[in-house]
Amino acid sequence: MLAALVVVYEMRMRSEGLQSVSPQGLIRLMNQGALVLDLRPAEQYQAGHLNGARQMSSEQIVSAGDTLKKHKEKTVVVYDDSGSLGGAAVRQLAAQGFTRVFALRGGLAAWRADNLPLSRA
């Protein structure tokens, strides 16, 4: 079921000209200093998130240009549980002048499926 959702999500992202990244690709981007934004509610973020990720709700993304303006030239990656909010967040950030924005393909579910670690801090 997850695989089917990931395929549908990926097709939608591509048809809209949006970029996504696999969990392994995200690790490379994180090692290069990417800004990672967790779109989930604060309670879910506190229960476990990607190391170094910053919690920012999808509502806050609408005005992220002000909050994150010093990061506009950095690579930014967004994620939620399933990847369903990633496309909208990528579009919002791109509209605000962010030039390298990606969504985590399959969201945190894909990260967990690859048995990758989470932080709880």
Outline where the language-model segments fall:
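Rhodanese-like catalytic fold shared by cysteine-dependent sulfurtransferases
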Residues: M1-Q24, L29-A34, A42-T75, D81-A121
